[in-house]
Amino acid sequence: MSRIANKPIVIPNGVEVKVEGNVLKVKGPLGELKQDFLPYVKVEINGNEMNVKPNVDYMKRRSDLKKMKMFTGTYWRLFNNMVIGVTKGFKKELEIVGIGYRAQLQGKKLVMNLGYAHPVEMEIPSDVKVEVPSPNKIIVSGIDKQRVGQVAADIRKWREPNVYSGKGIRYVGEVVRLKEGKKA
């Protein structure tokens, strides 16, 4: 059973939440997000609080309640991330480690030199903002936590940290365990 869904989600001032059928829409100062949800879940809005509960109208047998409670925890977390996203936003920072490895923005493209024979070009999605404050640092930010994390993971995938030398793209604060090389 999900116990996190027992807590209500606090809706801050300036954030508007609407439920239209099986779609939750959250509008705030940074933008607007919407999320579809299954009919197993019931969303109730009371003033500045939102509750996510299992929808017992869809329960056919007793074992369905376990599945419904599982979904309430998942959707509680998704809806909470939406409220945080439209108020504060999300940010992931990446650092590039390696001699000659660097990144730069060229219009709507992120161009990275990562030791390959050619520079790697990556199209930046419109719902995510990418900044390059220095050639060795990339900041990915946006209001949708899933999109920010996915774009950061896609950038990191171009050159994951090498387990022997540590060179590559890593998240800021990520600890890369280095293996010992061959002994002669």
From Swiss-Prot:
Gene3D superfamilies cross-referenced by the UniProt entry: Ribosomal protein L6, alpha-beta domain (3.90.930.12)
GO cellular component, one term: cytosolic large ribosomal subunit
Keywords in alphabetical order: Ribonucleoprotein, Ribosomal protein, RNA-binding, rRNA-binding
Keyword Ribosomal protein: yes
GO molecular function: rRNA binding; structural constituent of ribosome
GO-annotated biological processes: cytoplasmic translation
Pfam families linked: Ribosomal_L6 (PF00347)
Function: This protein binds to the 23S rRNA, and is important in its secondary structure. It is located near the subunit interface in the base of the L7/L12 stalk, and near the tRNA binding site of the peptidyltransferase center.
Family the UniProt entry places it in: Belongs to the universal ribosomal protein uL6 family.
Oligomeric and partner information: Part of the 50S ribosomal subunit.
Name of this chain's protein: Large ribosomal subunit protein uL6
Protein encoded by which gene: rplF
